[in-house]
Amino acid sequence: MAIAKGCLPSNVVPAKIKRWLESEEYSCVQIFGELARNTLFSYVVTLSPEREFVVFQPSNKNDSIHIAGALVLSADQIKKLRKKSKDEQVEIFMELRLKLASLDVEFSFEGREVCRRIGINHTIYFDGLTKDRLLKAISMFNKAYSLASWILKKSI
């Protein structure tokens, strides 16, 4: 099968992405084994001591790359959230939904009676994959993460 002009062959994508991440001085570590299950490659990238995300290619979607991570609520935030009424909790997470919906990310709220973490994912596709597109995707993830963090700090 011919590769379209400007597209990278899939066998060079992992090394190219690692090189792009390192050229921006991101700490980037490839993960293997159970932690990287169902992926063709997976890198943990550290933006700051409190912010990490994963860049990976799912084994069942060989035309896409995901930038994903989670904002984990602290024990103190969970405690404060529990003290709020159900209506107040719904209002906080409705605001989060409305603000995150305007960004090009998928998100999920995880937890039983109280949300404990917010999953954030941004997908990019191989056709025309460039360093610019990868870094813009990371920026979008970072904006969504920051926005969710700020709203939680303000609301809880």
Residue positions per predicted region:
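Ordered, soluble secondary-structure elements with a strong preference for glycine-centered loop motifs
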Residues: 11, 128-135
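Charge-rich, low-complexity N-terminal segments
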Residues: 1-62
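Short glycine-rich, low-complexity/disordered patches
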Residues: 28-36, 98-119, 150-156
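Mixed-charge, glycine-accented linear interaction segment located at domain edges/termini
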Residues: 133-156
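Glycine-rich, often proline-containing surface loops adjacent to acidic residues and nearby aromatics
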Residues: 63-68, 113-126
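Short hydrophobic interaction/assembly module
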Residues: 55-79
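A generic structural motif
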Residues: 73-75, 124-130
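Short, internal acidic amphipathic alpha-helical interface segments
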Residues: 70-117
